[in-house]
């Protein structure tokens, strides 16, 4: 049986292009604004949605996503409320894949079996848990896959030929290649190095390879899309939302529109590279 992720990548391949994967933080700056952004992402051009689980100690994230998580937590966002937002989204949109991205602690605290059951029931398609290495697959990766969720791993510029097989072993859905060494939202990727890295990963897996970290504009997205199966954009969207907030950190009348305008630009960039994704 194919999954929403399988269908999405197949559809993008049929169109000769990469998928646009957009990341937003659940509950930022408040649940209703977050949901308004979430529900509008597909129409703006997002093929896959990553929804961040806010956490107090997001070690892999830069200042933009750290601040977004703190805003969400201040507004009362929790794992349960995040799953509620996914449930509401899924009631309106049966097609667009939703990936939850975050850290293990909130999931562990919620309870792994309960979390997996509730995530599946809400309509989640997969998980990215950045602080669980392959050596700890029994904790969440294998139970998640048994529950029917994709478990997406990160590969980085420092993932060498000895380490890559372990990273890929239980990965499903797609492989997420981190284009730079460091935290989210950092420098612009070296597009030539990204192309080489994607080719190296593709030599060892049939899974789609998507690339993220440092992608900020439609031009960046187009450059990545020529060599990858998908392009992830997160910090740029979170930054755009943050800049639209008032001095108290609350949403304004232009907040949702500002995020969607950038998504449309990114989607145009990805689609302008059609024919380049192989």
UniProtKB/Swiss-Prot annotation:
EC number of this enzyme: 4.2.1.20
Keyword line: Amino-acid biosynthesis, Aromatic amino acid biosynthesis, Lyase, Tryptophan biosynthesis
Active site: 50, 61
Catalytic activity: (1S,2R)-1-C-(indol-3-yl)glycerol 3-phosphate + L-serine = D-glyceraldehyde 3-phosphate + L-tryptophan + H2O
Gene Ontology MF terms in the entry: tryptophan synthase activity
Pathway(s) annotated for this protein in UniProt: Amino-acid biosynthesis; L-tryptophan biosynthesis; L-tryptophan from chorismate: step 5/5
Pfam name, any one: Trp_syntA
InterPro entries: Aldolase_TIM (IPR013785), RibuloseP-bd_barrel (IPR011060), Trp_synthase_suA (IPR002028)
Residue pairs linked by disulfide bridges in the UniProt entry: none
Gene Ontology cellular component annotations, sorted alphabetically: cytosol
Record function comment: The alpha subunit is responsible for the aldol cleavage of indoleglycerol phosphate to indole and glyceraldehyde 3-phosphate.
Family as reported in the entry's similarity comment: Belongs to the TrpA family.
Complex and partners: Tetramer of two alpha and two beta chains.
PANTHER family: TRYPTOPHAN SYNTHASE ALPHA CHAIN, CHLOROPLASTIC, TRYPTOPHAN SYNTHASE, ALPHA CHAIN
NCBIfam families (UniProt xref): trpA
HAMAP family: Trp_synth_alpha
Protein name (Swiss-Prot/TrEMBL): Tryptophan synthase alpha chain
């Amino acid at each position: 049986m194919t999954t929403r992720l399988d269908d999405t990548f197949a559809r993008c391949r049929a169109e000769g292009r990469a998928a646009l994967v957009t990341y937003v933080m659940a509950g930022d700056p408040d649940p209703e604004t977050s949901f308004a952004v979430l529900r509008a992402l597909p129409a703006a051009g997002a093929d896959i949605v990553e929804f961040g689980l806010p956490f107090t100690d997001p070690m892999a994230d830069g200042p933009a996503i750290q601040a977004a998580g703190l805003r969400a937590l201040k507004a009362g966002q929790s794992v349960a409320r995040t799953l509620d937002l996914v449930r509401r989204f899924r009631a309106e949109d049966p097609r667009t894949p939703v990936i939850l991205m975050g850290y293990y602690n909130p999931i562990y605290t919620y309870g792994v079996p309960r979390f997996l059951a509730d995530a599946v029931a809400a309509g989640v398609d997969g998980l990215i848990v950045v602080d669980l290495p392959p050596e700890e697959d029994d904790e969440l990766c294998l139970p998640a896959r048994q529950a029917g969720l994709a478990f997406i791993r990160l590969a980085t510029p420092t993932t060498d030929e000895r380490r890559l097989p372990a990273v890929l072993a239980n990965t499903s859905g797609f492989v997420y290649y981190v284009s730079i060494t460091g935290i989210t939202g950092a420098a612009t990727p070296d597009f030539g190095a990204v192309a080489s890295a994607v080719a190296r990963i593709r030599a060892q897996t049939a899974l789609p390879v998507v690339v993220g970290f440092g992608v900020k504009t439609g031009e960046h997205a187009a450059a990545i899309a020529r060599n990858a199966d998908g392009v992830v954009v997160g910090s740029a969207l979170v930054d755009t939302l943050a800049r639209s907030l008032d001095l108290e950190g609350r949403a304004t009348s232009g907040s949702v529109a500002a995020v969607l305008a950038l998504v449309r630009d990114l989607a145009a960039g990805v689609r302008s590279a059609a024919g380049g994704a192989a």
